Amino acid sequence: MKPFRFLTLPSCLATMLATGAHAQSPEINFLGAGKQIVWYQDIALTEVQQSQFDKISKDIDYFGGFALNTENGAWGYTTGFFSQDLAEQAAVKICEGNARGRPCRLVAAVLPATVAPGTRNAFGFSKYKEKYYKSEFLPEVKRQKSGRYAAFAIGSRALGYDTNAKSADVAKLKARRNCEKAEAWNRKKSEISVRNAISAMDGQKCRVIEVIGPS
């Protein structure tokens, strides 16, 4: 087994993938190319606000949100999140920070096109993560000797895994820890407003979405 390499991602509930070798296996919703914009408020944006919104609408593989204070024109946006809920909540918190504590309203969200309209996605799985999951994680699982457990975890903006544990609990613990290392690295690279917004929520914590037991 090669040493574990935790993965950092750019400035992002999966459903169940059922195969016979999987002990606890939420189905993973692989999100394809394209995007959709969900408008929550019928508000005309200024030219500057529109240019900022255009930035998040270009990120087609991940989730983003845009919030606005209509009194003073302050705004906040997020992009590159694995989670629709976290992207929207963080956008509101960033906006309220820019608005000096005044309330902000969520104006819009940007979602991958494959997300069904009207559904909520606590975690999404982009094409990038699908490729990593299939080309790195699963092949490494197959190379392990019998009797070993593997786990795969994702957070708001990172992922991690372990494939050589003696029990399911140990595999989950290692996967979460590796994911959290990547989360911490990404938070250091983020703007202070984004770090504060994520830290104020539960979004920086990684969740195990896949556990594979001995076949």
Segment roles from a protein language model:
Residues 1-9:
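Bacterial N-terminal signal peptides that target proteins for export
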Residues 24-215:
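Secreted/extracellular ectodomain signature
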Residues 19-23:
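Sec/Tat signal peptide C-region and signal peptidase I cleavage site
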Residues 8-16:
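Bacterial N-terminal signal peptides
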